[in-house]
Amino acid sequence: MSTSSETRETRETPGTSSGTAVGPTTSRATDQPTNQATGHAGHAGHAGHAGHAKGRDAGAPVRGTRLTLRAATLGRPDAAALADVDLDVPPGEILTVVGPSGCGKSTLLRTLAGLLPALTGAVEQDGRPIVGPAADRALVFQEDALLPWRTLLANVELPLAIQGTPRADRRKLAADWLERVGLADRARQLPHRVSGGQRQRAQLARALAAGPRAVLMDEPFGALDAQTRAGMQDLLVEVLRGTGATVVFVTHDVDEALFLGDRVALLGAGRLVAVRDVPRPRERAAHDDPARVALRHAVLTSLNT
C-alpha cells in the first residue's frame, strides 16, 4: 500500500464490492465521506426508507422489509438470465437461493439491490419500485470490500459516518458490533493483518451496524475453508437472531442453504424452479432428520433436472 499523501478516492458502498460505483466517495487523505457519487446510498432508492437512519445497537430489533418480484425478467438486454420470476420475501425471513453456476443467482441479488434494473415486470420493496441502491438494503459479497487503510473499527464506522451519526455514537456502535462478531480484540488492526474469516466477520458487522432492513449476501463464505465456513454460518444465525432484518443469501452449497434458510429458492435453466420451506429446528444435529434428508434429496433432484 502506497504511503503517498496524494488524495485517492474509492467508491465504496457499505457491504458492496469495492468496484461497484453505487455509494458515496471517500477520500483516503481526509478519510471523510463526500457527496460526489451520483448513486449516494443515503438518498437512492424510493421515498420513505431509512436514508437518514443513525445505526442501531448490536442486536437491537429493526423492522424487516418485504421484497417482491412479479413476472420479472432479469439480466442484460442482450442476455436475460432469468425469466418470469414471481417471488415474495416477507419481512424478517431468511431466504436462501441455490443453483448451479451461471443460473442467475447473482443477477437476482443485484436486481434486488437496485444495481441492475429488471428488463420486464416489477421489483419492489414494501410495494414501491426499487429504482436504485438504498441505505436500508445492505450488501455483502464474497470479495473483500474492506478499505485497506482503515482499521476494522473504522471500516465498521464508515456507513454510520455516511448516515451522519455523531463520532462518539458511531465509535461505540462499531465497537459493540465488533464485539458481537468476536473481533473486539482486533478492532485496531488493518484488514491485511487478520484472517479471511475475520475480514468476513468485520464485513458482516459493517453491513449490520447501520440498521438495514434487508441484507443481501452473495456467497459471502464461498472462499473460506470448511471449518471457518461452518463457524461463520453459526455466527450469522446468532447475529441475525432477533434483528428482524430480511435476508436473501445466495449460495451454491445446498447444505448451507438448508441450514441457514427459512425457505430455499431453487434456480435453474433460466427460471425460478421452486421455493420450498425448510423444516426446523435450525441445528447441526438436524442434518440427518428424515424431513431434512428428504428435502435435500428433492433440492438436488430439482437442480439436476
Show the residue positions of the predicted features:
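ABC-family P-loop ATPase nucleotide-binding domain
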Residues: 1-73, 305
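Histidine (H) residue identity feature
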Residues: 40-52, 171, 192, 252, ...
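ABC family nucleotide-binding domain
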Residues: 59-244, 248-255, 260, 266
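Conserved beta-strand-loop-alpha-helix hinge in the C-terminal portion
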Residues: 270-297
